[in-house]
From Swiss-Prot:
A matching Pfam family: TOBE_2
Gene3D superfamilies hit by this protein: P-loop containing nucleotide triphosphate hydrolases
GO CC aspect terms: ATP-binding cassette (ABC) transporter complex
Entry keywords, A to Z: ATP-binding, Cell membrane, Membrane, Nucleotide-binding, Translocase, Transport
Protein name as annotated: Spermidine/putrescine import ATP-binding protein PotA
């Protein structure tokens, strides 16, 4: 797949503080790429440099192999959608969507045609004459997205656009965004701290920490094969166990809990259940390993967990193939 954006050894300094040390990243044309990390990791700064709102201190940004470090945002063929939608309150939906085209002196007939298609894609046709104050948060977000895609950008940049919405609406819009990206075929670069959001929408995920890229991969690769201690502890839940000079990670769904009355493999250790936590369709057992004193997590169905009580002695273990060695 063709590379549309290349980030080559880019750094960002604010005064003497290095926010992003040398960082390189290739972004493929037509992919949904999510930059994921905790607050302060540099993900939004990286997005703003790609958009042209921040200038790299060192290194180069390339679009279609052309250097764009000094190119102003409006010449980059990219649009940016923020968490705060910045809609014009005195304009209705259609006029908000057409505003950028009007400034670019696009013919009125073409404005209408392109706005119509953008509203169709974002399910806004019935709201075209409403002003922002008469729209829900999700509808306002759709207007911001429609306004961003109506100019046919090469790349759409999204900075935590769903962060202010409630859980159910967020889930609905996640599906809509992924379908929209698939239908448009343009590159989406999405910034979030929400792991579930990243996992559900992305073709690839870039996990950042303290300005560094910890790992790049598909959602399955990131979840099943974390490369570093940070990724293993940041993405989902993991049991981190000392193994010689390093560590291994074992997902709770791979940890087995057995009765002390069962014949057991030698790799299993004696432990006792310290707590049982209800987590929806599963129950989470906290088991203290008597040999290592590690507190291990194990997921079980409600039916499996019904046999246990806090304080029970059990055997706990896992298959070696379920261990992931961490750097």
């Amino acid at each position: 797949m063709k590379k549309i954006i290349k980030v080559e050894a880019v750094e960002k300094h604010f005064g003497n503080q290095v926010i992003i040390p040398p960082l390189s990243l290739d972004i493929k044309e037509g992919e949904f790429l999510t930059i994921l990390g905790p607050s302060g990791c540099g993900k939004t700064t990286l997005l703003r440099m790609i958009a042209g709102f921040e200038t790299p201190t060192k290194g180069n940004l390339l679009l279609d192999d052309e250097k764009i470090n000094d190119l102003p945002p409006y010449k980059r063929h990219m649009n940016l959608v923020f968490q705060h939608y910045a809609l014009f309150p005195h304009m209705n939906v259609e006029k908000n969507i057409c505003f950028g085209m009007k400034m670019q002196k696009v013919p009125v007939a073409e404005q209408k045609e392109r706005a119509e298609e953008a509203m169709r894609l974002t399910q806004l046709l019935e709201f075209r004459n409403r002003k922002p104050a008469k729209l829900s948060g999700g509808q306002q977000q759709r207007v911001a997205i429609a306004r961003a895609i109506v100019n046919n950008p090469r790349v759409l940049l999204l900075d935590e656009p769903l962060g202010a919405l409630d859980f159910k609406l967020r889930k609905d819009l996640q599906r809509e965004l992924k379908n929209l990206q698939r239908n448009l075929g343009i590159t989406f670069i999405y910034v979030t701290h929400d792991q579930e959001e990243a996992m559900s929408m992305s073709d690839r995920i870039v996990v950042m920490n303290k300005g560094h890229i910890e790992q790049i991969g598909t959602p399955k690769e990131i979840y099943n094969k974390p490369k570093t201690l940070f990724v293993a502890t940041f993405i989902g839940e993991n049991n981190i166990v000392k193994n010689g000079e390093g560590y291994v990670a074992i997902r709770p769904e791979n940890v087995k809990v057995r009765s002390v009355e069962e014949p057991i493999l030698k790799e299993y250790h004696l432990g006792h259940i310290e707590d049982i936590e209800f987590v929806g369709n599963m129950e989470k057992l906290y088991v203290r390993d008597e040999k290592t004193s590690e507190l291990l997590m194990a997921y079980q169905t409600a039916e499996e967990a019904a046999q246990w009580s806090i304080g029970d002695n059990v055997y706990v273990g896992w298959e070696q193939e379920d261990e992931v060695t961490l750097n």
